[in-house]
A protein has these predicted regions:
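Short microdomains enriched in Cys/His and/or Lys/Arg
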Residues: 143-155
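Short acidic, gly/pro-rich beta-turn/loop elements at beta-sheet edges
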Residues: 34, 123, 147
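Local cysteine-cluster metal-coordination motifs and their immediate loop/turn environment
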Residues: 92, 116-141
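FNR/FR-type flavoprotein reductase catalytic core
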Residues: 1-120
Length: 155
């Protein structure tokens, strides 16, 4: 979901002079799933220098925006490869979006993702979040793509 990225987006908004234009690509299964975030999405859309791109997985009555999966939409939008990418979402979306970003020319140190879905106790005791020699709760939950590529393919 969008919640883990809200603070970083707001930080960048507050320090816009250091970051330039921000491109947000937000996908959900249906337009109804966007309702929870509609207030903050509208706030970001009203902000000069923020480009908000919304997509839903399948056509739906009353939706006139983009329809399609996030990895494909990212390729269509062809984001600036000199920028940094921060993303979160279901593991399957992350996997295919990472592949698409690499195809577009992003290098492995420009892409950050979160793996908090694997956490349970969040203090390193239960071992549920262990991937290879890393504990998501202690070593993350945010990882660069190059760090992920060093881990076993469990995510």
């Amino acid at each position: 979901g969008l919640a883990p990225l809200r603070s970083v987006i707001n930080y960048v908004r507050d320090k816009r002079e250091n970051y330039g234009t921000v491109q947000i690509i937000y996908g959900s299964r249906s337009k109804d799933d966007l309702v929870d975030y509609q207030e903050i999405i509208n706030e970001w859309m009203a902000d000069d220098g923020i480009e908000v791109n919304l997509t839903i997985d399948r056509e739906q009555e009353g939706w006139d925006g983009h329809v399609g999966f996030v990895p494909n939409y990212v390729k269509e939008l062809n984001p600036d490869i000199t920028k940094t990418v921060v993303m979160c979402g279901p593991p399957i979306m992350i996997k295919f979006t990472l592949g698409g970003l690499k195809e577009l020319g992003f290098n492995e140190t420009q892409v950050f993702t979160t793996m908090e879905l694997r956490m349970k106790c969040a203090i390193g005791k239960c071992g549920r979040c262990n991937i290879g020699n890393k504990y998501v709760c202690k070593d993350g939950p945010v990882f660069r793509f190059d760090q992920l590529s060093e881990l076993p393919n469990e995510y």
